Design a protein with these regions (language model features):
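Catalytic "initiation/cleavage/transfer" segments centered on a nucleophilic residue
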Residues: 1-36, 61-112
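A generic structural motif
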Residues: 51-60
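Short, glycine- and small/hydrophobic-rich beta-strand elements in well-ordered beta-sheets
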Residues: 35-49
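Short coil/turn motifs at beta-sheet boundaries
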Residues: 8, 49-51
Length: 112
């Protein structure tokens, strides 16, 4: 397991699952975010080599802390990269869906 990644009183952050198998559908990401009660947008994109990866923008109403966020957001064996967004969370939201509906294989998996 990778080193712990702490989130301290953060409201907005972006998760990236950079390498996923073709049968990874993102439902595990949605399930975690539903359980945590945040607003979210999860999107699927294809790398140039045709392999999928996922982004998830997480928006909490109140500051969120987690002593081991990588573990919390791990889906199966897929560990995300985590990037805090302290300003302009709408940019992260837009980034997650930037090619949805315009490029084959790119779509929104879930949104709340």
């Amino acid at each position: 397991m990778p080193a712990k990644y702490k989130l301290n009183d953060e409201q907005f952050f972006l998760l990236t699952y950079p390498t996923t198998p073709a049968d990874f559908d993102g439902s595990g990401i949605v399930a975690i975010l539903e359980r945590l009660g945040c607003s979210y947008r999860v999107g699927r994109e294809l790398h140039q080599d045709g392999k999928p990866h996922f982004h998830a923008m997480c928006c909490f109403d109140e500051p969120y802390s987690d002593g081991d966020a990588r573990r919390t957001f791990t889906v199966g064996t897929r560990v995300p990269n985590i990037r805090v967004r302290r300003t302009r969370p709408e940019r992260g939201w837009d980034y997650v869906g930037k090619h949805a509906g315009t490029k084959e294989g790119h779509y929104i998996v879930g949104e709340k």
